[in-house]
């Protein structure tokens, strides 16, 4: 979370982007996570998430990601949400697969002037809505 909040972090990066939505999660009045949906072209947005390090592994990432997808595909009306995730983050990759994201490729970026390897994943609105319908009928 710290890297996303610093002066040149994600919040600053997306501060002036048109059609950008930010969602936050607080516990006891403290920010513990936030997500961003930043429009990349009509009907599509990039997803980013940041969690406080002491809150990982507790299901918070899944909750806030699910709520963000619901807003993005529902209220906002997006048709595609895409993301990049570090290749060395297996828990996040598993979460995105469980939520219906599909692997589309790989990319490399410099993060803090060091090379980092990422997976590119996306989720289409139709696939998201179909998976929600299946989940509801299984209940």
Each language-model region and where it sits:
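Conserved hydrophobic beta-strand within the GNAT/NAT acetyltransferase core sheet
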Residues: 47-49, 81-85
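Conserved acetyl-CoA pyrophosphate-binding loop and the N-cap/start of the following alpha-helix
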Residues: 55, 59-68
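Non-catalytic cap/lid and distal C-terminal segments of serine-dependent acyl enzymes
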Residues: 34, 81-83, 95
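Conserved active-site alpha-helix within GNAT-family acetyltransferase domains
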Residues: 62, 87-105
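C-terminal "cap" of GNAT-fold acetyltransferases
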Residues: 79, 86-90, 106-139
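Acetyl-CoA-dependent GNAT
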Residues: 1-56, 71, 124-128, 132-139
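Short beta->alpha transition motifs characteristic of CBS
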Residues: 36-39, 84, 107
């Amino acid at each position: 979370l710290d890297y996303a909040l610093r002066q040149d972090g994600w919040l600053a990066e997306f501060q002036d982007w048109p059609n950008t939505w930010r969602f936050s999660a607080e516990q006891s009045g403290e920010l513990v996570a936030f997500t961003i949906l930043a429009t990349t072209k009509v009907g599509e947005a990039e997803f980013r998430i940041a969690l406080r390090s002491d809150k990982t592994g507790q299901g918070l990432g899944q909750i806030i990601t699910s709520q963000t997808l619901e807003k993005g595909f529902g209220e906002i009306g997006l048709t595609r949400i895409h993301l990049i995730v570090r290749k060395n983050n297996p828990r996040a990759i598993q979460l995105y697969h469980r939520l219906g994201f599909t692997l589309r490729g790989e990319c490399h970026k410099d993060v803090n002037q060091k090379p980092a390897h990422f997976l590119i994943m996306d989720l289409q609105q139709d696939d998201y809505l179909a998976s929600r319908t299946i989940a509801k009928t299984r209940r």
